[in-house]
Amino acid sequence: FATTINVINSDNIKIENCNFYYPSASKRMLGTTSGMGSPSVMTFDANSDNNKVEKCLFEYSEGEAIRIKGDNNTIENNYFHHIDWSASELEGLMVSIYCTGDSNTFTKNTIHTTGASATVLPGTASTFSYNKVTNTGLLQSDGAVFQGTKANVANSKVHHNFVYDTDKYAFRYDAPGGDATQAGSFGIMHHNIADKTNGLMIKGNNQIIAHNTIINT
């Protein structure tokens, strides 16, 4: 019940055309409520770089869809829906897709119906592009689809995404504890569309926020 795929000390792996149906679950219904760990679907550890997940289906997982702790990994053209339906025992910031590595790319993915308040924690110097996202953060308050915390803002590139019909912020460059003076800086966010969302939240200095369309907020 720990994970469906666990990549350890491995580089240049490609996971393609895989279907993960109901891939993770705890033993709560069996009365076991301790020592379960987090029921994530796929994990890349900090020593796993230059891997790719492409054209896969992730649906009805109790925990996160993916955890990425390595660098230069790519998540491309996947379909995620009904992810982290319990929003419990998630790692770190508690998001649906969790990245802490450097220079990872999340592109051309479709996401809908998620539980955790924030959908994607991108990692440092990330690229988040050409994604379509809706109906997120159903079990928790606050949050955003793209959740850029202080450490994850610099050199991030957020562009050509369509986020719609969610109560959360579409894109967020945040600061710890709400202290705007501690916010990350030097992020780039351009050519995105947010329709019927909570809009954008941009903190920090020296950000480039250009050519975004925000309607029906």
What label would you give each PLM region?
Residues F1-N6, M29-D45, Y60-R67, S88-Y98, ...:
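Extracellular beta-strand/beta-solenoid scaffold signature
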Residues T3-I8, K203-N205:
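Composition- and surface-driven signal marking solvent-exposed, interaction-prone regions
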Residues D11-S24, S48-G63, D71-S86, T100-S117, ...:
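Right-handed parallel beta-helix
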